[in-house]
Each structure stands twice: as structure tokens, then as C-alpha cells.
Amino acid sequence: MAKDISRRSFLKALGGGAVASSALLAACKSDKQDTAKQQEPEKGKMTYRVNPGTKDRVSLLGYGMMRLPDKNAGKDPSTGTGEIEIDQEMVNRQVDYAIEHGVNYFDTSPAYCQGKSERATGIALSRHKRSEYFIATKMSNFSPDTWKREASIEMFENSLKELQVDYIDYLLLHSIGQGQDALGMFNSRYMDNGILDWLVEQKKKGRIRNLGFSYHGDVKIYDMLLKWHDEGRYHWDFVQIELNYLDWNYANEINDRNTCTGRAGAGAWLPLDIRPWCPAVLWYSPWGGWS
């Protein structure tokens, strides 16, 4: 592996969105002994969290594959097609560097990088042992032409193909709560077509190891899915939310729904305290660009 990527340049890429600062608070158990086991390591070493369901030892820093090195970046847009041309060699080098330094959680989606992220991610990761990394990808069926059952199934199968794997470690319903009619969109994407039940079946078959969702938007949908879990209707292994470090103190200045004031469950992080089953993946660059 090329050794000419410095820590400075790697973190610079992080600031540009190529790498997402994340925290996988697996299980979020309140047991003090479990917490003690996950204390900070010695300086310069990666911190890990243990998923109690699968016993995955997941790095506290994850790699977001939403914005990858683009050979066309910086070119005059009027002279090009506007399409991304991923610099696969650079992606490989950055992924190698990340794994070498303890990162083992890689988050992608069929929608990222104009649909090219999963393939680039698969190429980079396939050069490593499957046991060295965890892949998170999503059911990103945003467009109405992907709401049909067959189209959504094809999207999942294509993710496996592009990522060059036969199972997904962490599969998410992508960005629930979007749109003017958030409930209607959720039903169209996952319920009316039976795709959520189909994904549950894929988990039983071992093709999905952890099933969860990422949340952006209407908190009512977020609360609804947590209620389903409590009622035993569906089991969520993890939840992924966007959270900038500034949100801890200033989220209410942006939107009161971001805070834990008013009622339990309203805040992005409060459910982690009251629902110890639920790990969270926090994908927000420290510089503000989210992946």
C-alpha cells in the first residue's frame, strides 16, 4: 500500500466530506460494566463499540462514501457533462489508510456519487479480507419508479453485486421522514409494496445482518418506527441520525424538534438514554458537511 498519505491530508479529505465523522454507539447499554469495557484506548489508537446483537467490534470513526475524489472536480462546469468521474486509485489509497488505522465501518448508498459510490466502495474494499470491514448501505428508493416491489428488490440485489459481497452488515431504510407527506412517502417506499417485510425475510436468510433506518425530517415518522419496535411489530437493530457537534448546545436555535425539551423521544439523542437497545450512527463531518 502506498504510504504517502499523511494524517493531515487524510483529515483534510475528511473535512471535504470524503470521510464522515461518526460514532456507532452500539447497544448504548446502561450497564456500567459494559461502559467500562469501552473506555477510551491509549492515545493514537482507535476506539471501538461492541454491538451486543452481533458482537461486531465497530470503529468509533466511520468512513462515509457520499463524496469521493472526483477527477472532474475544479473543472469549468460549462465545458463538461457535470458527471462525476471517481478517482478509484485515490479511493483505494484512502480506504487502505483508513483500515490500516483502525476504521472498519464504511457507509454508502445506491444514491451516492450519482450512483457510482457502491461500485467504487466495492472495488476498494474487495482488496481486503471480508472480516476486516463492515458495510452499511441503504434502500434508497426515493424515486416513484423505484417504489414498485420489483424495482426495490432489484436495487438491493444490485447493491450486493456492486459491493462484491453476499451479505450486508448494516442495511438502512434511507432517510425516513422526507417530503411534505412524510407518512405517505414512507408507506409508498416501504409498506404498500411489502418491501419492509421482504427485507425482514432477507435478514432471516442471513443476507442482512442488521436492519435499521436513517432519519432526516418529520420526527413523527421517527417516533412511529420506535413505537413499532416497542410493540414488537418490527425490530430495529440500529438507527442512524445526522448530528453536528454544535447541535448538542444549539440545536434548539435551528428547530425545537431537534432538542429533548417538551417530551421524551423528541430529541435526536434522547432515545439513546431511554431505549438502550438502540445504537446510533452519527454521520456529520466536524466541518459541517454531512454524509
What residues fall within each predicted segment?
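Beta/alpha (TIM)-barrel catalytic core signal, keyed to glycine-rich beta->alpha loops juxtaposed to Asp/Glu
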Residues: I176-S291
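Short, acidic/polar
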Residues: E85-Y97, K148-E162, K220-K227
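CE4/NodB-like, metal-dependent polysaccharide N-deacetylase domain
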Residues: A151-L171, E201-K205
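N-terminal binding-site loop/beta-alpha segment at the start of enzyme catalytic domains
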Residues: A2-Y133, W198, K204
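Structural motif corresponding to the early beta-alpha repeats
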Residues: H128, E132-R149, H174-G177
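Structural preference for beta-strand elements that scaffold enzyme active sites
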Residues: V58-G62, Y105, E132-A136, Y167-Y170, ...
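Generic structural signal for well-ordered alpha-helices
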Residues: Y48, V95, E118, G122, ...
